[in-house]
Amino acid sequence: MNRGFSFSTKVATSLNRCNNRSNNISQSVSYNFINKPTTTTSSTTSASTTSQPSFSLPTSCNSNSPQSNLNSFRTKSQTISKFSSNLLGTALFEFQAFLIDDT
């Protein structure tokens, strides 16, 4: 039984790490989206003074409203993060219940 709880603790730790990485990526993308430097250079184009993001926006996004796009991105990423956390938490709970019942 101790082995089962040790394993489930390791799984929970791994899930927390994954969730933290997901949040860090989301925050990094959000930060870069808002705080992109106004002057960019690349090997193929000359310096630009636009404040547009360096990645292309999906067609469903409104290119005239970066803040709206960012809020939409945050909402979607938070929803996905919560869903995956709930799903994995439920699976972990069921696994622990199985271990307890099995002893």
From Swiss-Prot:
Region annotated Disordered, chain positions: 38-70
Record's compositionally biased regions (Polar residues): 52-70
Skewed-composition ranges (Low complexity): 38-51
UniProt-recorded name of the protein: Uncharacterized protein DDB_G0284161
Lineage of the species this protein comes from: Eukaryota, Amoebozoa, Evosea, Eumycetozoa, Dictyostelia
